[in-house]
Amino acid sequence: MKRGLMLIDRGSREREAEEELEIICKKVKEKGNYDFTEFCFLEVVPPFIEDGMEKCLKKDIDEMTIVPYFLYPGKKVKIAVADAMKYQKDTKIKFLVSKPMTMHRTLVDLVDSRIVSALKENEISLSKDKVDVLVIGHGSMDPN
């Protein structure tokens, strides 16, 4: 069975976003034994969902996993998944959709690592228990 993976990100004009997604796709491809991996963007810059899906559907695969590369579900994530799933009716490829990233123990480690890095980069010698942290999320207009 040949498998593909599509990461759907919000999109950013920052070149680093694309570079990081390329690295993530490469590593997930190796780790998950995917025949190919691609990424696309919901908005801001191409490749957009239509571009990514059309490219994927040209591949000789049996199954494609779609990963919404967002922390939490919301209106935009639901739109992204719905847009991707529109292509299901025109193909024999089986689509699997994962949940967005959501809560995972590695996120706690990541936040902790960012705090430690910020303290070092700013030459602040406080212990972590003396530091207040404000976490800012994007938010969603989705009532569900």
Each model region followed by its residue ranges:
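Active-site-proximal alpha-helix that buttresses catalytic centers in soluble enzyme cores
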Residues: 1-144
